[in-house]
Amino acid sequence: MYNKKYVIPLILVFLIGFFTPYWYNAMAGTLGHVPTLKEPAGNCVEDKDWMAANHMLLLQQWRTQAIRHGAEGGGIYHSFTTGEEYHASTNTCWSCHDSKEEFCDQCHDYVGIHPECWDCHYTPSVEKPHYSGIEELSKYFS
């Protein structure tokens, strides 16, 4: 190596610059802005801490019931927390959590994930299209 006296300090400066944000956050001991969610009225299907950790598993279970086992519109979900029975559908969630932007997106953006659920499914804040193409096809295939 011809320019050791320049290369080694440059590598050290790069490493220090790269790791400074990590060291700063480790020393400060803060997480930054943690989102605060609007508490909906009533009870959720399960308790708040369980839902924060496992809501995706619950939604996947409901999806499996609807798609693979033919429970159209979802089946019946028996809550372990309240003992009540709920309709296993995202519409059950939307009855309390009426804004995807104010509820779902805040936490998902905070942890840096982008679920693909909403590429196909509608949310309460999105207007459903009125034209599905079926009317057009029924003219030709009646």
Swiss-Prot record:
Q: Which residues cross the membrane?
A: 7-27
- Single GO molecular-function term? oxidoreductase activity
Q: Does the keyword Cell cycle apply?
A: no
Amino acids binding heme 1 = C93, C96, H97
Cellular component GO terms, alphabetically?
plasma membrane
Q: Where does heme 2 bind?
A: C104, C107, H108
Q: Where in the cell is it found?
A: Cell membrane
Instruction: Just give the chief location class.
Output: membrane
Domain of life, per lineage: Archaea
Whether Metal-binding counts among this entry's keywords is yes
Its PTM note reads: Binds 3 heme groups per subunit.
Which positions are tagged coiled coil? none
| Keywords from the named record | Cell membrane, Electron transport, Heme, Iron, Membrane, Metal-binding, Oxidoreductase, Transmembrane, Transmembrane helix, Transport
The chain's Cytoplasmic topological domains, given as residue ranges, are 1-6
Q: How does it sit in the membrane?
A: Single-pass membrane protein
Q: Which SUPFAM superfamilies match?
A: Multiheme cytochromes (SSF48695)
Q: Which residues lie on this side of the membrane: Extracellular?
A: 28-142
Q: Provide the residue positions that the database annotates as binding heme 3.
A: C117, C120, H121
Subunit structure of this entry?
A: Consists of five subunits: an integral membrane subunit, a cytochrome b-like subunit, a cytochrome c subunit and two iron-sulfur subunits.
Task: State its role.
Answer: Has menaquinol-oxidizing activity. HmeA, HmeB and HmeE subunits may together catalyze electron transfer from menaquinol to cytochrome c.
Q: What is this protein called?
A: Hdr-like menaquinol oxidoreductase cytochrome c subunit
Give the organism, scientific name: Archaeoglobus fulgidus (strain ATCC 49558 / DSM 4304 / JCM 9628 / NBRC 100126 / VC-16)
Gene expressing this chain: hmeE
